[in-house]
Amino acid sequence: MQVSEITHRTKTRPVKVGPLTIGGNNEVVIQSMTTTKTHDVEATVAEINRLAEAGCQIVRVACPDERAANAIADIKKRISIPLVVDIHFDYKLALKAIEGGADKIRINPGNIGRREKVEAVVKAAKDKGIPIRIGVNAGSLEKRILEKYGYPTADGMVESALHHIKILEDLDFHDIIVSMKASDVNLAIEAYEKAAKAFDYPLHLGITESGTLFAGTVKSAAGLGAILSKGIGNTMRISLSADPVEEVKVARELLKSFGLASNAATLISCPTCGRIEIDLISIANEVEEYISKIKAPIKVAVLGCAVNGPGEAREADIGIAGARGEGLLFRKGKIVRKVPEETMVEELKKEIDILAEEHYAKLEAEKAKLKEETQKA
């Protein structure tokens, strides 16, 4: 499908990945990738479970050989989030991964050989109802495209994507997700913009080979932030040379910055100044760690000045502003009570828990109401 303007994420074609629907709504799904050898089932499952606990919603594993492919079924049985299997050239590995219960495969159909091999993979994916992700990478574009454009360009990347899409569409396969990764931020932004104009399949966002924890976080936030701000993107991975749990943490913070994470708590904290009379930095870090696993849209403020604090964080749901020997606990900018400095963090945590429980109870009530209405209908 050729469109003339950017396809906003809410207008992309919905594609199912396990129990999740990718595209067709405002939720951008967080993805990461394991660093373990996939054939080591114990290590891989342990890492996936750590990622899921941190907020990862889809996980990808490498499948370079038959040992890895044979492990997919065992891994799948022991994890709680959808599993994507990364295949490069061997279609037989794709077939084995699909048979093992993969929720999605990442494969470029133009790279796996003769048409009958592609047909076999497409038929297996169709039979199981799983999508295929086409992964275009500026560093591995086809020779003919590099010869045409001279070097990796956004137009060349889109042409590569359309080539692989057409192979699948010609086989009447449309459960497709596409990524347009580059390590150059400007190239990635341009490629995703052009892709969003060229087709309406969901886009998986990423800046590849972005670097170490600090540099990669900055680079990914710069590139993916620009793309997200244009309404582009349905799934996202922050690629870091670090523990993959850090990728998930950065992704959550980035989505929260754009108001795209409906199930995450957010921290507001001031940059500190000479007026501060509490150890604000350590308090902010402690609170940030505490709220990292709370799946509720709560804004929490930690501020060092009792004079300006409540006013500066009027939009926060709950917060503390420290002063000498005490803190002010406030909700929605209004002071609730004074608390001693030594207990103010614990008091704040209690209030956070109350708000989280209220949110969870509201969700359960909404679910019950919806179930009742469905039964009546």
Curated annotation (Swiss-Prot):
<dbReference type="GO" id="GO:0141197">
    <property type="term" value="F:4-hydroxy-3-methylbut-2-enyl-diphosphate synthase activity (flavodoxin)"/>
</dbReference>
<dbReference type="InterPro" id="IPR004588">
    <property type="entry name" value="IspG_bac-typ"/>
</dbReference>
<keyword id="KW-0479">Metal-binding</keyword>
<feature type="binding site">
    <location>
        <position position="305"/>
    </location>
    <ligand>
        <name>[4Fe-4S] cluster</name>
    </ligand>
</feature>
<comment type="pathway">
    <text>Isoprenoid biosynthesis; isopentenyl diphosphate biosynthesis via DXP pathway; isopentenyl diphosphate from 1-deoxy-D-xylulose 5-phosphate: step 5/6.</text>
</comment>
<comment type="similarity">
    <text>Belongs to the IspG family.</text>
</comment>
<keyword id="KW-0411">Iron-sulfur</keyword>
<dbReference type="GO" id="GO:0005506">
    <property type="term" value="F:iron ion binding"/>
</dbReference>
<keyword id="KW-0408">Iron</keyword>
<dbReference type="InterPro" id="IPR011005">
    <property type="entry name" value="Dihydropteroate_synth-like_sf"/>
</dbReference>
<dbReference type="Pfam" id="PF04551">
    <property type="entry name" value="GcpE"/>
</dbReference>
<feature type="binding site">
    <location>
        <position position="273"/>
    </location>
    <ligand>
        <name>[4Fe-4S] cluster</name>
    </ligand>
</feature>
<dbReference type="GO" id="GO:0046429">
    <property type="term" value="F:4-hydroxy-3-methylbut-2-en-1-yl diphosphate synthase activity (ferredoxin)"/>
</dbReference>
<dbReference type="InterPro" id="IPR016425">
    <property type="entry name" value="IspG_bac"/>
</dbReference>
<feature type="binding site">
    <location>
        <position position="270"/>
    </location>
    <ligand>
        <name>[4Fe-4S] cluster</name>
    </ligand>
</feature>
<dbReference type="GO" id="GO:0016114">
    <property type="term" value="P:terpenoid biosynthetic process"/>
</dbReference>
<protein>
    <recommendedName>
        <fullName>4-hydroxy-3-methylbut-2-en-1-yl diphosphate synthase (flavodoxin)</fullName>
        <ecNumber>1.17.7.3</ecNumber>
    </recommendedName>
</protein>
<keyword id="KW-0004">4Fe-4S</keyword>
<dbReference type="InterPro" id="IPR045854">
    <property type="entry name" value="NO2/SO3_Rdtase_4Fe4S_sf"/>
</dbReference>
<feature type="binding site">
    <location>
        <position position="312"/>
    </location>
    <ligand>
        <name>[4Fe-4S] cluster</name>
    </ligand>
</feature>
<keyword id="KW-0414">Isoprene biosynthesis</keyword>
<keyword id="KW-0560">Oxidoreductase</keyword>
<comment type="function">
    <text>Converts 2C-methyl-D-erythritol 2,4-cyclodiphosphate (ME-2,4cPP) into 1-hydroxy-2-methyl-2-(E)-butenyl 4-diphosphate.</text>
</comment>
<dbReference type="GO" id="GO:0051539">
    <property type="term" value="F:4 iron, 4 sulfur cluster binding"/>
</dbReference>
<dbReference type="GO" id="GO:0019288">
    <property type="term" value="P:isopentenyl diphosphate biosynthetic process, methylerythritol 4-phosphate pathway"/>
</dbReference>
